[in-house]
Design a protein with these regions (language model features):
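Juxtacatalytic C-terminal regulatory tail of Ser/Thr protein kinases
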Residues: 25-38, 293, 297-336
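Protein kinase glycine-rich loop
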Residues: 53-59, 64
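AlphaC helix of the eukaryotic protein kinase fold
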Residues: 82-104
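Activation-segment/catalytic-loop signature of the eukaryotic protein kinase fold
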Residues: 116
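Conserved short submotifs of the Hanks-type protein kinase catalytic core
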Residues: 120-134, 138
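Activation segment signature within eukaryotic-like protein kinase domains
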Residues: 153-154
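Protein kinase catalytic-loop region centered on the HRD/HxD motif
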Residues: 159-169
Length: 336
């Protein structure tokens, strides 16, 4: 359960908070509301393995719930595919792919899938609860994110994506919502829902591009096959948004945003905000090159550039150490 005073998660059996020592409410006296159909169906699907606590939010594909793992007494997040989408073969396939893709990737900066299952039209995946929120939260709260903080986070994510790329998996939906943080501030990439092997066909039978238009590479917006450099482009957009508070392209609909991704050049972030250094802007703009060959060849190359940038900034030893540890956490073979 979560402490009502400081928000720290505590074991279900705890009487007082491990951080602030405040008395914790007894479970039977905790406020409750009549469970909706999704919660009822989820409880039926998961049985006694998880204790569903509350709904955290809802996205285009799934509802997200906070729960306790009954045996391990640790918080988890359960994503439940919307019931109407569970009847859609294409969406079911996408949701299934997320679980399978994440299960194949074991890396300290990739959010693992702990469990998955289906009971009738209730389809769910279970992941660890990450208490640090998302990069999207940080941008919304502060309008922009400190350049070194953003560089550290994206360096960690880039190393994780390089690991995925070397196993033939491209994420294809990088955005601030999918960059989460653990309690120590380490960045974790999640939501491999439209990840696919580099040389497989597109997921959609209609051939439409899958992803979020504001973060799509030009080749992805055109529905072409993509490789890891497409994710590098998306990381550049995430860095851009962290630096100035908004992505480089916007429009009234997905088509207009996709058109700009393909045909228009972004304004350099240091032109928009003079507080953005030329060095940091140059890293971002290289990621945003229209031609994949002009970008960083590998996500690890982007990580190295970001680490060099952090190293050039005085007094940021902790951020440098975190990025360097991530870079060398998994041995990486040379590019073939």
């Amino acid at each position: 359960m979560f402490c009502p005073e400081c928000g720290t998660w505590n074991r279900t059996s705890a009487d007082s908070c491990v951080r602030c020592n405040s008395a914790l409410p007894e479970l039977e006296r905790a406020p409750s509301e009549k469970p909706n159909e999704t919660i009822s169906a989820l409880r039926q699907a998961t049985g006694s393995r998880y204790r569903v606590i509350q709904r955290l939010g809802s996205g285009g594909m799934a509802d997200v719930f906070l729960a306790d793992h009954a045996q391990l007494e640790r918080p988890v997040v359960i994503k439940v595919l919307h019931a109407h989408l569970a009847k859609d073969t294409e969406m079911m396939e996408r949701f299934r792919r997320e679980a399978q893709a994440a299960a194949r990737l074991v890396h300290p900066h990739i959010c693992p899938v702990m469990d998955a299952g289906q009971h009738g039209t209730t389809v769910y995946t279970v992941m660890p609860y990450l208490s640090g929120g998302s990069l999207s939260d940080r941008i919304a709260r502060n309008k922009t994110v400190d350049a070194v903080e953003a560089a550290m986070a994206i360096a960690q994510v880039a190393v994780a994506l390089d690991y995925a790329h070397r196993r033939g998996i491209v994420h294809r939906d990088i955005k601030p919502d999918n960059v989460l943080f653990d309690e120590d501030g380490n960045a974790i990439i999640t939501d491999f829902g439209i990840a696919e092997a580099r040389h497989q066909g597109r997921l959609t039978a209609s051939g439409r591009a899958m992803g979020t238009p504001h973060y799509m590479s030009p080749e992805q917006a055109m529905g072409k096959l993509v490789d890891g450099r497409s994710d590098v482009y998306a990381l550049g957009i995430v860095l851009y948004e962290a630096a100035v508070g908004f992505p480089p392209f916007d429009g009234p609909d997905a088509f207009s945003v996709g058109y700009k991704q393909v045909h228009e050049q972004p304004v350099s972030p240091d032109t928009i905000d003079s507080r953005v250094s030329a060095e940091f802007a140059a890293i971002i703009m290289r990621c945003l090159s229209k031609a994949p060959a002009a970008r960083y060849a590998r996500a690890n190359d982007l990580a190295d550039a970001l680490i060099a940038f952090i190293k050039s900034m005085p007094g940021r030893a902790d951020a440098l150490r975190a990025a360097q540890v991530a870079r060398h956490a998994v041995r990486t073979p040379p590019a073939s």
